[in-house]
């Protein structure tokens, strides 16, 4: 990724995982880890605001659990961000509940890339997440690949570099 002009903050998941079960498991199964993870991200973002950064200077980037958490945090706190880049992820929860998402992305670019047949992230959840995020005012781009790999592809990186990290 073209990140030479960016300051990178990479919070680490406690114990190496943001939540213990699938992102589409019953919500109670992932508590309290899920709420604690959202709070970790919130503290990082609030610290950036306290240091004088604007929301449009903040990008969220993640893969797999990190992608899901990036989409989830940004959608629960929608405003004009620099962008949200999700390499294989979707909104978190057994069922999507539009009532838990608030705000307006004001055209924030959001990228979601994945395999058409990812073993951890169903295509139907990515599509439903993209639709919900669009309804919150984001400009969403999805790229799907015919493989079955749970990975970040060079084509995804190239698209993000060209269109979001210029």
Region roles according to the model:
Residues 1-57:
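Serine-hydrolase catalytic machinery in alpha/beta-hydrolase-like enzymes
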Residues 12-16, 90, 148:
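Short beta-to-alpha linker loops that shape the active-site pocket of alpha/beta-hydrolase fold enzymes
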Residues 20-26, 89-109:
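Flexible "cap/lid" loop of the alpha/beta hydrolase fold
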Residues 61-66, 70:
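Gly/Ala-rich beta-loop-alpha elbow adjacent to hydrolase catalytic centers
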Residues 72-83:
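Conserved hydrolase catalytic core segment
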Residues 111, 127-166:
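C-terminal catalytic histidine-bearing segment of alpha/beta-hydrolase fold enzymes
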Residues 111-114, 118:
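Short beta-strand/loop motif that positions the catalytic acidic residue
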């Amino acid at each position: 990724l073209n990140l030479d002009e960016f300051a990178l903050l990479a919070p680490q998941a406690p114990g190496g995982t943001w939540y213990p079960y699938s992102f589409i498991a019953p919500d109670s199964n992932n508590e309290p880890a899920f709420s604690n993870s959202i709070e970790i991200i919130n503290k990082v973002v609030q610290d950036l605001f306290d240091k004088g950064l604007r929301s449009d200077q903040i990008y969220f980037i993640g893969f797999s659990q990190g992608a899901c958490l990036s989409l989830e945090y940004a959608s629960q706190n929608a405003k004009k961000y620099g962008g949200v880049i999700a390499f294989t992820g979707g909104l978190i929860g057994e069922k999507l509940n539009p009532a838990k998402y608030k705000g307006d992305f004001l055209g924030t670019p959001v990228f979601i890339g994945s395999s058409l047949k990812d073993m951890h992230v169903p295509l139907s959840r990515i599509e439903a997440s993209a639709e919900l995020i669009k309804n919150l005012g984001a400009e969403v781009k999805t790229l799907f690949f015919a493989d079955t790999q749970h990975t970040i592809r060079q084509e995804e990186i190239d698209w993000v570099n060209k269109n979001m990290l210029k």
